[in-house]
């Protein structure tokens, strides 16, 4: 049987407040520790756009105002096996952005322990993995053009 990659959406989540773009990053606690954007699996038969809306709501407690799909995707292998992901060796991601209202975030405490609203320069330093840093650059370039 061929090794499988779990299909997910990466969601660079932002809000525009006082003419500045603020990015929402979450502090991961499940499976690994570090900072990331909301992300999550695409549940069959849901669409990628529906997965974006669901994951943003689940992980932040906020509804999306705008969603944009980007022509960027990739995959990565897990560094170790996870009991809840035993059928997969890694994840294949599709990049989206989602605008939400700036303000209070209601975290899913099983996955994340904290959050921050940051400007691009601060967010790019905090994000843990290179593929999410690249995703942030792509979205920021689009939003600031």
Task: Show the residue positions of the predicted features.
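Nudix hydrolase/Nudix homology domain
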Residues: 29-35, 104-145
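Conserved Nudix-box catalytic region and its N-terminal flanking loop in Nudix hydrolases
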Residues: 20-63
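Conserved N-terminal beta-strand and adjoining loop/helix that marks the start
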Residues: 1-23
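Short helix-loop capping/hinge motifs at secondary-structure junctions, enriched
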Residues: 18-19, 102-106
